[in-house]
């Protein structure tokens, strides 16, 4: 869904809101693509947090190298 959104989205600060409105109104099923993309991203981060919680529960933080690589990947994912 991100590829279809990227075809119509304009990152310019002046026209960004207009391009989102264009996606929702003028693109066939654009509102659905935007909705699926937003909910898919939310689900991705929920799964990410569950994975961190599982690592904390099972004591994976004691493996410092593995844990630090995971934290770096988390920060890079959010950046």
Swiss-Prot record:
Heme b b566 binds at residue 51. The keyword rRNA-binding does not apply. Heme b b562 binds at residue 37. It is found in: Mitochondrion inner membrane. The chain crosses the membrane at residues 1-7, 31-52, 67-79. Binds 2 heme b groups non-covalently. One of its GO terms (molecular function) is ubiquinol-cytochrome-c reductase activity. GO terms for biological process: mitochondrial electron transport, ubiquinol to cytochrome c. GO terms for cellular component: mitochondrial inner membrane. Heme 1 (or BL or b562) is low-potential and absorbs at about 562 nm, and heme 2 (or BH or b566) is high-potential and absorbs at about 566 nm. Belongs to the cytochrome b family. The cytochrome bc1 complex contains 11 subunits: 3 respiratory subunits (MT-CYB, CYC1 and UQCRFS1), 2 core proteins (UQCRC1 and UQCRC2) and 6 low-molecular weight proteins (UQCRH/QCR6, UQCRB/QCR7, UQCRQ/QCR8, UQCR10/QCR9, UQCR11/QCR10 and a cleavage product of UQCRFS1). This cytochrome bc1 complex then forms a dimer. This is Cytochrome b. It comes from Dipodomys heermanni. The lineage of its organism: Eukaryota, Metazoa, Chordata, Craniata, Vertebrata.
């Amino acid at each position: 869904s991100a590829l279809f959104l990227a075809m119509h989205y304009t990152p310019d600060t002046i026209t960004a809101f207009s391009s989102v409105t264009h996606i929702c109104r003028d693109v066939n099923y654009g509102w659905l693509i935007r909705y699926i993309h937003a909910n898919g991203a939310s689900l991705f981060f929920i799964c990410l947090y569950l994975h961190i919680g599982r690592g904390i529960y099972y004591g994976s933080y004691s493996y410092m190298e593995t844990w630090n690589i995971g934290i770096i990947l988390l920060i890079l994912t959010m950046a």
